[in-house]
Amino acid sequence: WSEVINEAERHYQPGKFTTFVGYEYSATEGGMAHRNVMFSGSPKQTGSIIPFSAFESQDPEDLWKFLTKYKEESGDDVITIPHNTNLSNGQFFKNETFKNTPFSYDYLQVRTEFEPIIEVTQFKGDSETHPLISPDDSYANFERGWFDTLNRARDDSLGVKIDKAERSHARSVLKKGLNMKKEFGVNPFKFGVIGST
């Protein structure tokens, strides 16, 4: 961790090249639910912690609790960036929490705070949409990647495959977020999108 912090500092060039200290939280229970954790803080602040990993807990709520404490103690910002949601086997955008409990306002508010953007494309494929959920979109099959979330669901019924695809891709969840805003007063899926190499 100290090497990551030192490298970020070494390559930082104010006004020319911005670096962030960060790491990957790699939860894998039931499907890949990976998040990049990015800190805005100084080396002193980020160096005061040991990153919270999926070895401590696979539940993102536990990660967010750890990061909330960090924010309160340091005064710095931190975000988590979901990525490879296409490989989540429907786990990333489930209709309940990791512990299979109903969503609460507090849960949705915390998720909104920590996840303002998601990665929708990278070399492991596209997380924007899927041909099963966007059959009329000629680009829905673009960059499916070497491993698709539905490879794990090949023996499932078409309805289950569609459900898993909807819970793994950004375009579907944007609609879900609008409905959640009506129900809960908060939209946890109002996010920007990024692409990575």
Regions found by a protein language model. Name each.
Residues W1-T197:
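Extended, charged catalytic domains and RNA/DNA-binding interfaces, predominantly
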